[in-house]
Amino acid sequence: MGMLKIGKNCSVCKEWQEHCYWSHMADHSKHFLKHMVGDFTESMTVPARFANNFNGHISEEVNLRSPSGETWSIGVANSDAGELVLQPGWKEFVDGNGIEEGDCLLFRYSGVSSSFDVLIFDPSGCEKASPHFVGSHGFGRAENSAGAEQGGRNGRRTPPIVDGDNGHRHHLEMTLHRNSCRSIPRACKRSLFSDETEAKENDGEDEDVVAAAEGGRYGEYYFSRHGRVAEYNLREEDREEISRVPVPVQPGNPVFVQVIHSSHVRSSKYCIVGVSPEFAGKYLGAVEREVVLERASRGGEWHVPFVHRQNTRGFYGAGWRQFAGDNRLVAHDVCLFELTMVDAAASGGGNRRRRWSRRPTMTVHVLRRVRGRFVLLR
């Protein structure tokens, strides 16, 4: 009788635990595991129990973020058996991350708009190294591996961004394991430096084109003009829709609108998130300074350098990468940078003018397209 009673109680406890897990635990604490076997390269089925409990949270398109920070948009289809299947774009994700038969993928739901962080393990159960370096030659991403930016045990650190190719190259060359005799192979080193320089130049060119012309305005919204990368350009109807989204912007605060490029969230690349000359000139001035970014819905603040050069104005560096990573930004997100303004008495008169207090502070509101329309992320 005692054993039966214990068994019954355990069953009730398990049901209660299941309910608490799916209904009350934070979404970003939920995971599922998939072994890559059979014909895994063309599609992947989401476990039924996970899919059923996330009904309404998984949209027609999901974003998969690999360990490198690269993000893939994957289409979601329904099978004849009623299962959710990742299909359009899945093959590109598999090929891009070198996923092989026998590998195991751990998916962690990020809690926002059908986005998952993915860890990739080999058949031995060890995490694979190569997915950490997608889009690089294997060294830039290492600076953001476990413990690196927090002064981990291996003694590595994130090299600061240095103006000029020579300073940037010097810091990259010195990024070695303190207790290791291995160094970067010469051929890879040449490729790495050329890639970093090319990324710096290309990103700058794209941002200059985006920000060079006067941005379109809707009320206090400043929109960037079209750039060279067509997929990141906002159409007129997009701007109108964004202007209608009920974003909690304080009256009188100017807002700059920027579409996030893949290079803006790729931590292994040097890039600048461009700000239009009109907005920068009117509100931020021609001085390089630190800007504080905040998220009203999440709390916390991030200190991000604002650079002002001859052809480029915008955010850059480790501060921006930290902000993008902590807030799980993905390519094609739309960020609304709301500059917090206060009233100040104009010198020599009773009129009042609007300015930012102490240092520039911006509240960032993030929009993401879900099922064909822009929604505000919390």
UniProtKB/Swiss-Prot annotation:
Region of interest (Disordered), ranges: 140-159
Domain of life: Eukaryota
Keywords of the record: DNA-binding, Nucleus, Repeat, Transcription, Transcription regulation
SMART domains: B3
Classification via SUPFAM superfamilies: DNA-binding pseudobarrel domain
Single Gene Ontology MF annotation: DNA binding
Coiled coil: none
DNA-binding interval(s): 29-124, 256-370
Protein name according to UniProt: B3 domain-containing protein Os03g0622200
